[in-house]
């Protein structure tokens, strides 16, 4: 089974081709990683690669309640608990840097932090706050040129802290409607400067963030996650020239020599299915222009994963929710064992219930 075969990612020797996808779990009380989180990730260290939950590079990026950050010494030391737990089991782990941008509430931000976005366009719907329950999304402030420069520098600083904390690398969250994706999408980016307008200009923020992280961690330790055609968090799900824009972005990311391109298909959860030709061409453009591996994610089972690996469509396959209730997912796939079903009610609640209490298969 190719899914269970080793793979070399940059200079990392992965024991298999299963990636634990990034999943927000809201257990970081005070936005600081803790021993409970270390236990959770350590339990799942048999994955070839773990990508952490979205982690804010600055106070401005903390849109949700109880998500972790990596912008302080305390957070760095909290994450060190996690990386040591994973490495003790022989695993590898990347941190996912996620700036929420407009996806947030001022009630979830620490004092002095600001809700910022490419344009002053509010999200629809409501968001959970620990202090006042469900609340409407607040309208963000449009980022100035200085705000953009500061945000890029914050990604650089966060990447440096991540390496100090022992992470094997960094994934840029450019998917699912968060800040990098907000710059890519014309619905959330209505600017008419160098960071808005045509697709190439909307790509600029993502590329500048990638360069900043490469400067801190090296290209071989930097990946990016994208979700073309995604609709999560009010993204457009498709627009004129989207394929051209994303293929150009993949080309430029390849030229930077990134370790991997991680593409997400959310059609299993109701989003439009990405155009297969666009995904294939993005992967080809990334690889042929100097990029490393491809990771595909979204609704996979072992059979589909094996098909895409053997065809060369991808090098690695990311699994998300199956890892929640199956910390021993790799072993279950190896043995053909049935999978436990996760409890959705505990996906985002604090504490160990539905987090570290799922047993391995007997």
Locations of the language-model features?
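Flavin-dependent oxidoreductase catalytic cores
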Residues: 1-362
């Amino acid at each position: 089974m190719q899914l269970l075969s080793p793979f070399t990612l940059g200079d990392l020797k992965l024991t298999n081709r299963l990636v634990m996808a990034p999943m927000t779990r809201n257990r970081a009380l005070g936005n600081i990683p803790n021993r409970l989180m270390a236990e959770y990730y350590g339990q799942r260290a048999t994955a070839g690669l773990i990508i952490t939950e979205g982690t804010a590079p600055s106070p401005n990026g903390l849109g949700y309640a109880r998500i972790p950050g990596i912008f302080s010494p305390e957070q760095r030391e909290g994450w060190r608990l996690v990386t040591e737990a994973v490495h003790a089991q022989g695993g590898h782990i990347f941190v996912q840097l996620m700036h929420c941008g407009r996806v947030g509430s001022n009630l979830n931000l620490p004092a002095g932090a600001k809700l910022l976005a490419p344009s002053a366009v509010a999200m629809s719907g409501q968001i959970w706050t620990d202090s006042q329950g469900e609340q409407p999304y607040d309208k963000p402030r449009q980022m100035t040129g200085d705000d953009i420069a500061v945000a890029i520098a914050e990604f650089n600083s966060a990447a440096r802290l991540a390496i100090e904390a022992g992470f094997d690398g960094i994934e840029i969250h450019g998917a699912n409607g968060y800040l990098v994706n907000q710059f890519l999408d014309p619905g959330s980016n209505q600017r008419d400067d160098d960071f808005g307008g045509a697709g190439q200009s909307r790509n600029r923020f993502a590329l500048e963030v990638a360069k900043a992280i490469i400067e801190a961690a090296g290209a071989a330790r930097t990946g990016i996650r994208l979700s073309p055609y995604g609709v999560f968090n009010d993204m457009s799900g498709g627009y004129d020239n989207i394929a051209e824009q994303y293929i150009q972005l993949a080309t430029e990311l390849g030229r930077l020599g990134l370790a991997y391109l991680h593409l997400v298909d959310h059609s299993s959860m109701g989003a439009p299915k990405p155009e297969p030709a666009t995904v294939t061409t993005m992967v080809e453009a990334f690889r042929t222009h100097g990029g490393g591996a491809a990771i595909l994610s979204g609704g996979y089972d072992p059979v589909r994963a094996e098909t895409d690996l053997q065809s060369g469509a991808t090098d690695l396959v990311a699994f998300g929710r199956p890892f929640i209730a199956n910390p021993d997912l790799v072993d279950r796939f190896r043995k053909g064992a049935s999978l436990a079903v996760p409890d959705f009610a505990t996906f985002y609640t604090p504490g160990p219930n539905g987090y570290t209490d799922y047993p391995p298969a007997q």
